[in-house]
Amino acid sequence: MRYPIATFDCYGTLVDWEGGFGSFLYAKALASGDEGPPPGRELRERFEAIQFDLIQREYRPYKEILAETLRRLCDERGWPFERGDAEAIVTAMRSFQPFPDTRPALRRVRAAGTRLVIVSNTDRDIIEHTLRQLEVPFDDVQVAEDVGAYKPSDEVFRRLLERLGERPERVLHVAFGFKYDIGPAERAGMRTAWVNRHQEPPPTVVAYDHEWRDLWGLASLVEDAD
């Protein structure tokens, strides 16, 4: 087997983070009386940009990051930030669904003998809901709450490798995001796989080892290595 361990970004790689937040934010826009809101994707991209700025500051629990990100987006758009919005966005995230390929592909990867590990920018009580949605056992889960830091901090991947007790070149990190995942995993010496679900052109400044449109590519890789 080529990679004894596969580590995964969760939201955006295994779970439809983009669609989930896009739908939530578009519904918030309409409920706020925004007569000409941009598409959900545009709102989600702005939400992500605000969030990325916040997670690079002093560590705060992810639920607080979500609430502050939404509050700032509401301020920008002229929407009211209402009582209950902070809890509503956390509740929405807990219900985000896996991509159609996620469960069956992960079952194949696990059946091939590869250990499955999640490394996620979230809180423990949020990821626990998502794990129930995934329905596939994971050997370990590391969240930002465990480390006191968020990806793309190099500390996240240093602690991950320490936790795994494996040489970095024997660990494959699977993710859709370059700035959060592929770049810092490469710096840590891990092998990397880009899940390019939207068939986007690759950035020219970050190297990676594999590229697939979905997780079926990973399943084939580990099965062929047996």
Which positions does each model-derived feature cover?
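Asp-based, Mg2+/Mn2+-dependent phosphohydrolase catalytic module
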Residues: M1-P4, E18, P38, P80, ...
